[in-house]
């Protein structure tokens, strides 16, 4: 749960002096790159084994990551999301696409996902800073003062999709919903998948540390 992954830090600065060194402007950029937090891919919905019914719609049951041929034999029920109904075949195709586009899940096809095996996306934060120095002579003394303007997460100012920090509630992603078994005598598992995962992603955008740009 507490694996930090990798962290990259870079700093670039340039100072420009002029007006016989009475004035100076310093422009700097700071880059911080951080691996995402560990996450587990679990079933949403009903508990699959003898667990108590889950709270919050998530179980602790790690998902089986199906191969393409596995998907063909799985039972999906129609799923209506925001007024749009997806057929079982549409859900299977969407889940297959999601798995193939996920760097971790595509390596686990035909196996169960591992606890904390996945990660939220890598975070890239770029901060901008400009400092203006003034050297003023007051009588026999020379006084220097500085005005500073900073923009935190300037990438997010340029593009709202840049500089985002992601998280998963309780470090779990309920990727596939386990609806239940066909009947008490037919233990064929039934599932649903929300194709919106392919457009909206599986993670939430965090308010920490710097989800949106800010200046001071």
What are these regions (language model features)?
Residues 1-216:
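Short, solvent-exposed micro-motifs at the edges of structured domains
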């Amino acid at each position: 749960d507490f694996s930090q992954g990798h962290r990259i830090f870079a700093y670039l600065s340039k100072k420009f002096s002029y007006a016989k060194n009475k004035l100076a402007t310093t422009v700097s950029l700071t880059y911080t790159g951080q691996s995402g937090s560990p996450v587990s891919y679990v079933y949403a919905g009903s508990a699959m084994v003898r667990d108590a019914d889950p709270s919050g719609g998530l179980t602790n049951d790690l998902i089986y990551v199906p191969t393409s041929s596995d998907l063909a034999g799985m039972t999906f029920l129609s799923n209506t999301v925001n007024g749009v109904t997806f057929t079982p075949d549409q859900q299977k195709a969407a889940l297959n696409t999601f798995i193939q586009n996920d760097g971790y899940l595509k390596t686990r096809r035909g196996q169960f996902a591992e606890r904390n095996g996945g990660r939220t996306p890598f975070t890239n934060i770029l901060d901008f800073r400009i400092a203006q120095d003034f050297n003023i002579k007051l009588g026999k003394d020379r006084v220097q003062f500085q005005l500073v303007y900073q923009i935190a997460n300037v990438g997010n100012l340029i593009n709202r999709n840049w500089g985002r920090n992601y998280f998963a509630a309780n470090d779990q992603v309920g990727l596939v919903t386990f609806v239940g078994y066909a009947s008490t005598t037919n233990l064929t598992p039934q599932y649903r998948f929300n194709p919106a995962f392919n457009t909206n992603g599986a993670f939430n955008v965090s308010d920490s540390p710097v989800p949106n740009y800010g200046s001071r």
